[in-house]
Amino acid sequence: MHDTILKSKVFLDHIAIESTNPKKIAEFYSKNLMMKKKCVSNIEWHCFGPNRLLIFKKGINNKLSCAAFGCKSERKLNKIRKRVLSEKIKIKEYSSIYLEKSSFSIYDPDNNKIVFGVPLKRWSKKNKYHAPLQHLTLQSLNVKKIIDFYHKKLGFAISDRVINENGVITTCFFRSNKEHHSLACFKAKNVGIDHHSYEVGKWKLIRDWCDYISKRGLTLFWGPGRHGPGNNLFVFFEDCDGNKIELSAELELIKNRKFLDWPHDARTLNLWGKSYLRV
């Protein structure tokens, strides 16, 4: 029962982010990440592409409205629900046009809303720029309490940790399937979203994506580089609200290994060069 999430092969299905101008940010993703946009109401826009779905709601810029994790059967979802209830975590039924009616939501120690459900079938036609939404990274004042919640209570597996010279965990990477992480958390001065990431597959596709967004006037603020934990290649850029977006390639696939501890230094975050340290 300890690795309930991992054994259920959970994946990040979609995220919802608040914005003072949902229409504007939806137009950004439609133009620059080749996602179709849909106006749901005057305060909510949806963007979707092959295996990537984002929801933008009227609110405070850069605030996570929710992160929705999917699994492929009601049986697996029921196991997760049972695990959550056994930990005495309060559950609320969750309604979404993208998930089966059995979906539910909970809140983590930083008051981030986390949803679990079985995704309904939707458009997933691949093209040259296939880039599924792959992981969400959070910021927290206290990474340990995030570990206690997601690992000990929910059953995400730990892939890697980053520890500073005082023995404090500054970063933790959680996996819910064979991919190195579908969720991570950095120790920071703020609480909320750090970044979200799309897995493009191969290194040459990062090149193609960078050429594509460059033609639209965007510039990278970090990368190209290679992370230590996960060993993936990456680039980062920002959307019109300042949300950080990662394009990743060749993320480590883990069959069965114990987590590794990495030092809190620049080379851990980028084996190739300059780093982006949160604290």
Could you describe each region identified by the protein language model?
Residues L53-I55, K90-E93, S159-D160, S182-A184, ...:
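A short linear hydrophobic-aromatic micro-motif
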Residues K7-R52, Y98, S102, L138-H181:
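Core segments of cupin and vicinal oxygen chelate
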Residues M1-K23, L64-F69, K121-K145, A157-S159, ...:
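N-terminal beta-strand motif that seeds the catalytic metal site of vicinal oxygen chelate
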Residues L33-C66, N112-L120, R161-D194, V200-W203, ...:
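Conserved short beta-strand elements that form part of the metal-binding/catalytic scaffold
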